[in-house]
Amino acid sequence: MDYDIRMVLNNAPPATDMPKILQLLDAGLGNQAYLVDLGDGRALALDPTIDLRSLDAAAAAHQLSVVFAAETHLHADFLSGATRLARRDGARVISSAEGGRRFEHLGLVDGEEVDLGGLTLRGWSTPGHTDEHMSYVLLDGVQPRAVFTGGSLIVG
C-alpha cells in the first residue's frame, strides 16, 4: 500500500483528538519506545526494549495494561521486550510477516490492519533500515492519528 508521509501527517487531527501516546526514550541507545493508551485501560507498546522498567512505570502511572506489543523490525541494534511482554503479560506480538521470526506473532503484510478495540493499527512496509521493516499507522476509524516509523526515520 502506497502512502505519502506528508499526506498522513498533513491530515492528522488536532492534538485534542489524539489518543494518549507516551514516548519512552532510551538515551543510552538512542531508541524510542511508545505506549499508546487505547482508551479502556489497555495499551499498545511499540518497540519496547528488553529492560521493561520504564514501560512498566509508565503503564502503572497511567493505569494501563499492555495487551499488544508491536515491533517495527528485527532488532540488531537493541533487544526487544515484545516477547517478554507476551510471556509475562500475555500481550499479543505484532510484526512484519517477513523476516523469519521464530516466536509466536501476528505477521502483517503491507496494508493489513489489526483491530485494537476502537483504534486500528495498519502495517506499512518501509524496508530500508532492515529488509522487513514495518512502520505503523494508527487509525481512529479512517482518520490517521499517528505514524510509528521505528528505525526507518531517525529523528534528532
What label would you give each PLM region?
Residues 29-30, 50-127, 139-140, 144-145:
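Active-site HxH/HxHxD metal-binding segment of metal-dependent hydrolases
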Residues 73, 130, 151:
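Conserved functional loop/turn residues at catalytic and ligand-binding sites
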Residues 150-156:
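Active-site gating loops and adjacent loop-to-helix segments of metal-dependent hydrolytic enzymes
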Residues 127-134:
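Active-site glycine- and acidic-residue-rich loops that bind
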Residues 76, 132, 154:
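Short active-site segment of divalent metal-dependent hydrolases/proteases
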Residues 11-64, 135-150:
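Conserved beta-strand hairpin/beta-sheet module of binuclear metal-dependent hydrolase folds
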Residues 3-5, 9-10:
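Short, positively charged and aromatic/hydrophobic N-terminal segments
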